[in-house]
Amino acid sequence: MTESPLLYDSTDWDFRTLQRSYDAIERIACEELGLEVYPNRIEIITSEQMLDVYTAHGMPLTYRHWSYGKRFLQHENSYRRGYSSLAYEVVINSNPCISYLMEENTATMQALVMAHAAFGHNHFFRNNHLFRQWTEASAILDYLEFARSYVSACEDQHGVAAVERVLDAAHALSRHGVHKHGGARPLNLKLDQKRERERRDYDESMFDDLWRTLPGTKAKNTTDSVVERRRRLGLPEENLLYFMEKVAPRLQSWQREIIRIVRLIAQYFYPQPQAKLMNEGCATWVHQRIMTRLHETGQINDAAFLEVLHSTSNVIMQPGFDHPAGGPGFNPYALGYAMMSDIERICVEPTEEDRRWFPDTAGNGDPLGTLRHAWANFRDESFVLQYLSPAVIRRFRMFRLLDDTSESTLLVDAIHDDAGYRAIRRTLAASYDPAAHDPDVQVVDVDLAGDRRLMLQHRTKPGQLLAQRDAEATLRHVSTLWGYEVRLQEVDADTEAVLATHTASPPAPA
């Protein structure tokens, strides 16, 4: 009796089944598709464990904080009441690349999510320039262990409430705690531990209670002194947490280290939203290609392949703009997969329109090389600007609305002609620009020898001011870390006119 070529023939699975499926998927991914991946670690988890993974933003471990418990309860209540379902998998940008698979998955779904996460996402994490520039996959797990141990030690030494105040403030500012230009310094756990010891030893050696009895000096209020102190402090500075860690006058060394932990973890996540469309599009295209090849070679049967098609169809469903289930923006799985498939088509079977729009790509006969090049060298904004085709614009029935606040109606000002295609492509690409979503808030001045008031500036446009309640709540967190008054001015980026001012003072000592 000859052995069946099928990897499995039922919905049930065991670990030998997973190993056979993984080996077959790996051969196609690496030998046929030319994917380059980190070593994989596959973990099977329960629904309760998946909720824990959700709580920590997909990371396998983290420090204690009340916000994680709150997030766990929100996800748990939504899941238990049937308002939401859990993901089939979660994958972590680390080396080795960790993929969490739900134990409730069928044998087919386990194969699909291994192809999707362990090879699609894994290849993207390893090769995309954003992740190569901003993250250190080999060091993140060790650093998270250090962070958890350090925060726990601070809680034992200084009290949970004191640590919580610093974490609350740092979390509130985490989106303003990343270096957006020039790349990130690679994580080095030994250097971080050495620096933390040196900070503690320095604070102990420099302490002298007599310093508090000396009278203060009056600062010079001249244009030269303002320019000089701003130059000395490296202002303006957009990384608020970095500035707090280095300059805040009242922070102790352990508080500075906690701020550093929060901002380095925020830096690790910085590339993710900038490449979500590409990342999900890459992983979906990869899993669909691999599962199709498994079916073509007789390694999965028709029933399994129908399950693959059903799952993928659900994932890439794009509701219409006026559909009750629709919302602003596009489903990243749907648009990402459509663009990857369209690039493949343009490389192999281009139309005359494709040749006009993509002369360097159309008919080159190398769809895999073209896709790998795109995955490595673009982010969502530039990817849409470079590769969104008229065919995909028509398929998704895209159009552009002009929302003029002085008019009572909306105007459709870009439709399906050459000028409209270009306008739609530019507008959609701009919507993926991270600068369009995060306010440009920078430290612009502080007189450390004077009143120590911290001056922040938000460069914006009339009609695009910060919500007052949110701005004031966030400023209170800034003042908690700074220790003195903080003032935020919202300034017209074109005219330099001050549009609004917000002020916050630090809380009274407990």
What are these regions, as identified by a protein language model?
Residues 104, 108, 124, 299-510:
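Non-catalytic terminal regions of proteins
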